Amino acid sequence: MSLPYHVLLTGATGFVGGTTLAAFLEREDYKAGRVKITCLVRGEERAKLIKERLGVDVVVCDLADADVVRKAASEVDVILHTANADHPASGRAMLEGAKQRFDKTGKQTIFIHSSGTGALTDDAKGKFADPKIYQDRDCADIRAVPTTYVHRETDDLIMKASVEGYVRGYVVMPPLIYGRGRGPYSRTSVQIPALIRAALRLKQSIHVGPGLSIWNGVHVDDLVSLYFLLLDDALSGARKAPTGLECFYLCATDTYEWRELAAEIGKRLHAKGAIPTAEARPLKPEEVQDALGAWSDFAYGSNSRSAAGKAYDLGWKPKHPTGSNGLFDSIDKEYDAVIEEGKDEAPKVHIDEMNRALGS
């Protein structure tokens, strides 16, 4: 594909999408004027701020506005979809737009979709560690996961469109995402802040059941770097990154048991004087939903184990510590973010910070 190119980014006001937008604005091809970015944004006020202060184009719409989403997708070379992995209608509309473009021009749209290893969970409820680790150098096990599972319907749509050939699709499957975001609005992740809020509310760190189940983690900046690795490969003539039936990309760098994470949260919050004890306790089954919300057995008590393969083959170089050190060391900053965002006077808009970071 010849430059310049046009990108449609969804989720720009969110944690992952906002960090992706910040990284796009730092790229040399963007600074050189070779990239046009259009963001799908819900809400006139947010859209206006992003357009005026960051200088990117916006389309104001909800993901449910299929006609608007379809048209926006039909006009771009690249779709980077981070907004919602469980909204197949919008994924379908984007693919329909890409198909219209292909039928008109013969050009494939590059489609990078942010899914998640929530699709690979079990129902352990913290009771055991499953030895199964999903791999991505052969995606047969991933493809075998039913499309009724979380994320899988949208993933399957993109895979089939990639096989058909009108998009060059990549389904990136991050595990728990940690770290501080760099976008214009939401800068906190989901799972660790939720566990911190629960610990503050219950005055003790908690885990689902015995907490023996195992998950993985990845820093948000390392995740975003994989998006751009795939993008650059797709834009190049070499195109080494597999797509089609092998379009799934895992990106785990950290491994932890839920009880280990809970113990680390308890230790660090107790050291700050935020909770009266460092000891973590198991939640009883009847306590889980009240403590952590719906689907908590899966989000905080399942096994979801994966190993990055193809990303490393392409030259992915995560910058944050692997094992569990990077993940555990992020807890202090996640705690600070939870406290900051809980204050009425806390800044909810980070566009000035983004501009300072960009030197503008």
List the predicted regions and their residue ranges:
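Amphipathic terminal alpha-helices
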Residues: 321-360
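Glycine/proline-rich active-site loop of Rossmann-fold NAD(P)-dependent oxidoreductases
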Residues: 179-193, 230-248
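A conserved pocket-lining segment of Rossmann-fold NAD(P)-dependent short-chain dehydrogenase/reductase
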Residues: 194-221, 226-230, 241-242
